[in-house]
């Protein structure tokens, strides 16, 4: 059976991930007119720039959908976001600022929950608005087929008939008007935005050029912290975790993770926390650039890692970072539910996150400028009395340290011998002015 359909399957049910925007509206209407039977599915991901979710399915019905459903994905989205924080599943960083994989997390939830809803309705053909150059086409492909092995894919934007008739936004707008719908194109921005409750992605158009900075972006989850005319007073905030799960903000306990994430977004957003500019490597290994917002994820991540460093030992922390980066890349590639990702997630949540209990107090200022004011946990292995510089009882004596240093003589001797061995082979240079061989200055060798 062909998995990807190049042309419209006339007379068959097609599920379309319907956002209510111009692209999906025109595609749905076009498919109905050409003889397909479209079903519309809209994911409620708590998008900060969406005002009326209930109106979206109604519009889909007006445009010819056989049926239209609104699928509430918020709870699952937040659950996956918290899992990503527990695992440190983030691999794109620039200058210490992190991209929290908010779009990949959204695609994992959307791709599985919408296809599951389609399967309930007997719809086994799926279409969405992802383009052939991007990451989402592969993410949705993987998650869709994982959820429904019988799934076939039809994308209007890969259909030459659709492209020839409605290849641009102007053509789509004119098509809608000609069909009796008073559809006005939204004002063109200098970039495109995709968002969910965890974060927002701004990319494309002017942002494809690296001389266009964050200053052209209008944040939808925070403030323009770079604009000195925007007043942002400093604010203290406390974040409490229990066994790796965020449970309280500023002393208020949340039983609903969705409400907790919304409040974390409000707190972080007041300062522009979690906004970053990243050059990343797409799945197809071409580089792209995005400007990201994730105020709540950033707030929780900072507090989580503060507790992590005070609770776990060095080797555990090293494994957390290494496995987290690996898991973040799998998430980015659309492999969040693959066996290798599940193995890493289980290990990190079981042996790392389970011990993260405590409370962190921070002072948030402008953007990603913050200070940690206090860290409290019953699981802290940080014990100031162990290494105090003050006179008093100590867990080890000067003689103990002399013995420990003496034992280092063995590997110091081995290292010295290796260095002189490298010098003999020409990898290092040796001179009377230096006690050990050193790498030669390449400039002196004309290289």
Curated annotation (Swiss-Prot):
Q: Which enzyme type, at the first EC level?
A: ligase
Q: Which InterPro entries match?
A: Arg_succ_synth_type2_subfam, Arginosuc_syn_C, Arginosuc_syn_N, Arginosuc_synth, Arginosuc_synth_CS, Arginosuc_synth_type_1_subfam, AS_cat/multimer_dom_body, AS_multimer_C_tail
Q: What is its EC number?
A: 6.3.4.5
Pathway the protein acts in? Amino-acid biosynthesis; L-arginine biosynthesis; L-arginine from L-ornithine and carbamoyl phosphate: step 2/3
Q: Which PROSITE patterns match?
A: ARGININOSUCCIN_SYN_1, ARGININOSUCCIN_SYN_2
Q: Does the keyword ATP-binding apply?
A: yes
The record's GO molecular-function terms, alphabetically, read: argininosuccinate synthase activity; ATP binding; identical protein binding; protein homodimerization activity
Pfam families with a match to the protein in the record: Arginosuc_syn_C, Arginosuc_synth
Its Gene Ontology biological processes?
A: argininosuccinate metabolic process; L-arginine biosynthetic process; urea cycle
The portions of this protein that span the membrane are: none
Sites where the protein binds L-citrulline: 99, 135, 139, 192, 201, 203, 280
List the record's Gene Ontology CC terms alphabetically. Answer: cytoplasm; cytosol
Does the record's keyword annotation contain Transferase?
no
Locate the residues binding ATP.
Answer: 17-25, 43, 129, 131, 136, 194
Q: Where the protein is mainly located, per its record?
A: cytoplasm
Question: Record-annotated residues binding L-aspartate?
Answer: 131, 135-136
Kindly state which keywords UniProt assigns to this record, in alphabetical order.
Amino-acid biosynthesis, Arginine biosynthesis, ATP-binding, Cytoplasm, Ligase, Nucleotide-binding
User: Where located?
Assistant: Cytoplasm
Instruction: Write down the SUPFAM superfamilies for this protein, in alphabetical order.
Output: Adenine nucleotide alpha hydrolases-like, Argininosuccinate synthetase, C-terminal domain
Catalyzed chemical reaction(s): L-citrulline + L-aspartate + ATP = 2-(N(omega)-L-arginino)succinate + AMP + diphosphate + H(+)
Q: What is known of its domains?
A: The monomer is composed of two major structural domains: a nucleotide-binding domain and a catalytic/multimerization domain. Binding of ATP results in a large rigid body conformational change of the nucleotide binding domain.
Family (UniProt): Belongs to the argininosuccinate synthase family. Type 2 subfamily.
Instruction: Report the PANTHER family cross-referenced here.
Output: ARGININOSUCCINATE SYNTHASE
Instruction: Provide the assembly information.
Output: Homotetramer.
User: Which HAMAP family does this entry report, sorted A to Z?
Assistant: Arg_succ_synth_type2
| This protein's name | Argininosuccinate synthase
Source organism? Escherichia coli (strain K12)
Its lineage opens with: Bacteria, Pseudomonadati, Pseudomonadota, Gammaproteobacteria, Enterobacterales
């Amino acid at each position: 059976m062909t998995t990807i359909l190049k042309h419209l399957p006339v007379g068959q049910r097609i599920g379309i991930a319907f956002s209510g925007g111009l692209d999906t509206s025109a595609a749905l209407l076009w498919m109905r007119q050409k003889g397909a039977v479209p079903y519309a599915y809209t994911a409620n991901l708590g998008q900060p720039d969406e005002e009326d979710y209930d109106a979206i399915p109604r519009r889909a019905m007006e445009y010819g959908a056989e049926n239209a459903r609104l699928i509430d994905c918020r709870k699952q989205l937040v659950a996956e976001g918290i899992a990503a924080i527990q695992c440190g599943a983030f691999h794109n960083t620039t200058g210490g600022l992190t991209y929290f994989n908010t779009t990949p997390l959204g695609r994992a939830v959307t791709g599985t929950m919408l296809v599951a809803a389609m399967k309930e309705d007997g719809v086994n053909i799926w279409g969405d608005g992802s383009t052939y150059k991007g990451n989402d086409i592969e993410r949705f492909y993987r998650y869709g087929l994982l959820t429904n092995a019988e799934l076939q894919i039809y994308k209007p934007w890969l259909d030459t008939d659709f492209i020839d008739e409605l290849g641009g936004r102007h053509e789509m707008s004119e098509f809608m008007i000609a069909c009796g719908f008073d559809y006005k194109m939204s004002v063109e921005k200098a970039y495109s935005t995709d968002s969910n409750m965890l974060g927002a992605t701004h990319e494309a158009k002017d942002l494809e050029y690296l001389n266009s900075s964050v200053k052209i972006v209008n944040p939808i989850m925070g403030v323009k912290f770079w604009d000195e005319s925007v007043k942002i007073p400093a604010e203290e905030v406390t974040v409490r975790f229990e066994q790796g799960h965020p449970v309280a903000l500023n002393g208020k306990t949340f039983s609903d993770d969705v409400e907790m994430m919304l409040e974390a977004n409000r707190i972080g957003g007041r300062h522009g926390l979690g906004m970053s500019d990243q050059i990343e490597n797409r799945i197809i290994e071409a580089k792209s650039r995005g400007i990201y917002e994730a105020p709540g994820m950033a707030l929780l991540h900072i507090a989580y890692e503060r507790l992590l460093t005070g609770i776990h030992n060095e080797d555990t922390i090293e494994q957390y970072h290494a496995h987290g980066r690996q898991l973040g890349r799998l998430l980015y590639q659309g492999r969040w539910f693959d066996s290798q990702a599940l193995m890493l997630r289980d290990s990190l949540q079981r042996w790392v996150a389970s011990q993260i209990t405590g409370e962190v107090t921070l002072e948030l200022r402008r953007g990603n400028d913050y200070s940690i004011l206090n860290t409290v946990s019953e699981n802290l292995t940080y014990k100031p009395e162990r290494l105090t510089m003050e006179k008093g009882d100590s867990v080890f004596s000067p003689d103990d340290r002399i013995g420990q240093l003496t034992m280092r003589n063995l590997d110091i001797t081995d290292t010295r011998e290796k260095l002189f061995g490298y010098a003999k082979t020409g990898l290092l240079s040796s001179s009377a002015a230096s006690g050990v061989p050193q790498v030669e200055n390449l400039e002196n060798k004309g290289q």
